[in-house]
Swiss-Prot record:
This is G-protein complex alpha subunit gpaA. Residues 323-328 are annotated as: G5 motif. Signal peptide: none annotated. One of its GO terms (cellular component) is cytoplasm. G-protein complex alpha subunit that plays a role in conidiation and regulation of the biosynthesis of secondary metabolites such as dihydroxynaphthalene (DHN)-melanin, via interaction with the G protein-coupled receptor gprM. G proteins are composed of 3 units; alpha, beta and gamma. The alpha chain contains the guanine nucleotide binding site. Interacts with gprM. The keyword Magnesium does not apply. Residues 32-353 form the G-alpha domain.
């Protein structure tokens, strides 16, 4: 009886080699694929970051894609003015010019979703006239007392351009457009040798139970906080401070058993609005232990420490950036730094460093 391998042994060895080769291929693919979860409370800027990725890494928006944003922008603009006018009633703030009452009725006659290739001229005129009214301006200054889109002032200031018959949204117009994210959306794009799969989930409370489906094999979490909302209340529950809600959510994510080994990149976002608000809306009114007054650097340090100190795991890395998600130049720079971090984390997770 010979000592050579039997046919069965040879087949077994070939199968083992095939499995090992497949595992190596899978590991190489895993090394080149980044699965990133975008988390954060509602309106923190997650969808804006995804739009920036398209601008920075996919050549931006085509003419047809820009055209498709027109109705969203028209609706955002009209609805924002409607919200202010309704707030004027509840706050008992009058129009400075009674003749603008005609324009108020024009706004209230508009449907929730504005359809068509152009904004009706009477609507553009109404928004322009109302935005110049000091009563509307006074109500806008008190917007922390009601729920108003961040993009309102931007679109109102640009209403003459937006109301043009040949209007085509700019990059900035698109970035500032707002559609509530429901469910889970996946965006894939390539940076160098890496394929990013970014998952955006609805930030409102009712959406959070759906996040669990995204949790497996996540390379990293990108968690966004709108730090400008330190003086605002939740859309879903007007007894809860938005910053407190963000802290609670970050605590649950950072210390979750699902993410024991997952690094977190924390974007403290909307720094432009934050800087504007500090002098007129004291942070100490909402966070009594804050002692930095209107000093921007002190306020940033305070918020940063409030979030980072929630991390209970010594081995978990939290990388922080102060961001303005609508600033493409800044986001390009920040995401380049994030890319370097992710490459290192991915190599570590794959056991290659």
């Amino acid at each position: 009886m010979g000592c050579g391998m039997s046919t069965e042994d040879k087949e077994g060895k070939a199968r083992n080699e095939e499995i090992e080769n497949q595992l190596k291929r899978d590991k190489m693919m895993q090394r080149n694929e980044i699965k990133m979860l975008l988390l954060g409370a509602g309106e923190s800027g997650k969808s804006t970051i995804l739009k920036q990725m398209k601008l920075i890494h996919e050549g931006g928006y085509s003419r047809d894609e820009r055209e498709s944003f027109k109705e969203i922008i028209y609706s955002n603009t009209v609805q924002s003015m409607r919200v202010i006018l309704e707030a004027m009633e509840s706050l008992e703030l009058p129009l400075e010019d009674a003749r603008n009452e005609y324009h108020v009725q024009t706004i209230f006659m508009q449907p929730a979703q504005i359809e068509g290739d152009s904004l009706p001229p009477e609507v553009g005129n109404a928004i322009g006239a109302l935005w110049r009214d000091t009563g509307v301006q006074e109500c806008f200054k008190r917007s922390r007392e009601y729920q108003l889109n961040d993009s309102a002032k931007y679109y109102f200031d640009a209403i003459d351009r937006i109301a043009q018959p040949d209007y085509l949204p700019t990059d900035q117009d698109v970035l500032r457009s707002r559609v509530k994210t429901t469910g889970i959306t996946e965006t894939t794009f390539i940076i160098g040798d890496l394929t990013y799969r970014m998952f955006d989930v609805g930030g409102q409370r009712s959406e959070r139970k759906k996040w669990i489906h995204c949790f497996e094999n996540v390379t990293t979490i990108l968690f966004l906080v709108a730090i400008s909302e330190y003086d605002q209340l939740l859309f879903e529950d007007e007894t809860v401070n938005r910053m407190q809600e963000a802290l609670t959510l970050f605590d649950s994510i950072c210390n979750s058993r699902w993410f024991v080994k997952t690094s977190i990149i924390l974007f403290l976002n909307k720094i432009d609005r934050f800087k504007e608000k500090l002098p007129v809306s004291p942070m100490k009114n909402y966070f009594p232990d804050y002692e930095g007054g209107a000093d921007y650097a002190a306020a940033c340090d305070y918020i940063l420490n409030r979030f980072v100190s929630l991390n209970q795991a010594e081995q978990k890395q939290i990388y922080t950036h102060f961001t303005c998600a609508t600033d493409t130049t800044q986001i390009r720079f920040v995401m380049a730094a994030v890319n370097d971090i992710i490459i290192q984390e991915n190599l570590r997770l794959c056991g290659l460093i």
